[in-house]
A protein has these predicted regions:
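Short acidic low-complexity segments
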Residues: 29-39
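Amide-donor transfer/coupling interface in amidating biosynthetic enzymes
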Residues: 105-205
Length: 205
């Protein structure tokens, strides 16, 4: 039976994503080995904490090559820090290389508002894509972050939000997607987006 793999590298909110996919009825597996990732119909890379720690944890897990391969071949979604890891580098704590799947870098949000941004904020969808299908512009989703992406290619920017400055909320390029917000914590809107992602994988309910 086909399934969606949730990458377990020791730095992600695995269970909330797993439970949400279960709720939606999509087969999924916690993936702590490369073969589970390689055999998946789609892959989700969650992430919490600091960028350098997450990249080090991914390296130590031995899953980096499987993740890179999956991101080039099948529907792939990075969530929160997992989205940030898709980019080339971050200056959180210290300059650190990312996965380099998207050009650009991660920097602290320059805003007069309190950091981290915690709570609900509206999406301004700039470039509709498969994951935003059926969503109304201005839909609210749930954020928890202090750093944001600066995509080098504006065409990769799918949606933004306003937090005293324009903050990239979603990126998309081909089969590759990233959500700075947490779809698994974003109510009906988040459920719809994860359903849309699951449809791309063709995993049966």
């Amino acid at each position: 039976m086909s399934y969606i793999a949730i990458v377990d590298y020791g730095a992600g909110n695995l269970m909330s994503v797993h439970n949400t996919l279960d709720y939606l009825g999509y087969e999924n597996k916690i993936a702590a080995s490369a073969d589970v990732i390689e055999n998946a119909a789609g892959v989700i890379l969650p992430g919490v904490g600091a960028f350098p720690d997450a990249m080090a944890a991914l390296t130590d897990s031995g899953l980096t090559e499987a993740v890179l391969k999956a991101a080039k071949e099948k529907p792939f979604l990075g969530i929160c820090l997992g989205m940030q890891m898709l980019f080339e580098e971050s200056d959180e704590v210290r300059l650190c290389r990312g996965l380099g799947l998207l050009p650009g870098r991660i920097e602290r949000i320059e805003t007069s508002l309190k950091l981290p941004q915690i709570g609900w904020n509206a999406l301004d969808i700039l470039r509709p894509n498969a994951m935003t299908e059926g969503l109304e512009n201005g839909s609210y989703v749930y954020f928890v972050h202090s750093f944001m992406a600066h995509p080098a290619d504006e065409n990769d920017l799918a949606a933004v939000t306003d937090y005293g400055t324009r903050v990239p909320a979603m990126v998309a390029r081909g089969n590759l997607f990233g959500c700075q917000f947490h779809p698994e914590k974003s109510g009906e809107v988040g459920l719809a987006m994860l359903h849309n992602f699951a449809k791309l994988t063709e995993v049966e309910k």
